Amino acid sequence: MKIHEITPKDYTDLHRLYCQLEDDWTSDIQDMIRVLEEVKDDPHYHLVGIFDDADKLVGTITLSKCLDLTAKARFYYSLENLVIDENYRQQVYGQALMQYVEDYVRRHNGRYVNLTSSIHRTDAHEFYYRIGFPRNYTVGFKKNVVDD
């Protein structure tokens, strides 16, 4: 298994993974690529993939560097869109990807990681608890400001 940043050659497989993440996810691959191109050179955004021994993309996570002036004026990292291919779940891929993220955050002087997950993804929540995310720590809110 290998973990590294997603490259343009991985975009089709990345789109396939995102289709597994949400049943109603309808983003066109070209829309996804357009957004990725907008942030590709921004050092605060990282799109990381985990690959099996055959170099197939089997999981991904988005990692964003954020500022928290109330936390000893240090940075934290926001984790979004963690998805492991449904045929590779309950193996080591999710845990390995999250360990990579924790190591990355430590190396880059991050104080903590903040993770969001859709409320209905209870299996994912159990995974997060098992790897050390505390229960009932915060409540998150999301408000759409544009009607799609």
Protein language model annotation of sequence segments:
Residues 39-49:
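A short helix-loop-beta-strand connector motif used in the catalytic cores of GNAT acetyltransferases and
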Residues 84, 90-103, 130:
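Conserved acetyl-CoA-binding loop-helix of GNAT-fold acetyltransferases
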Residues 49, 56-65, 83:
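Conserved beta-strand in the GNAT
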Residues 98, 105-117:
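Conserved GNAT acetyl-CoA-binding A-motif
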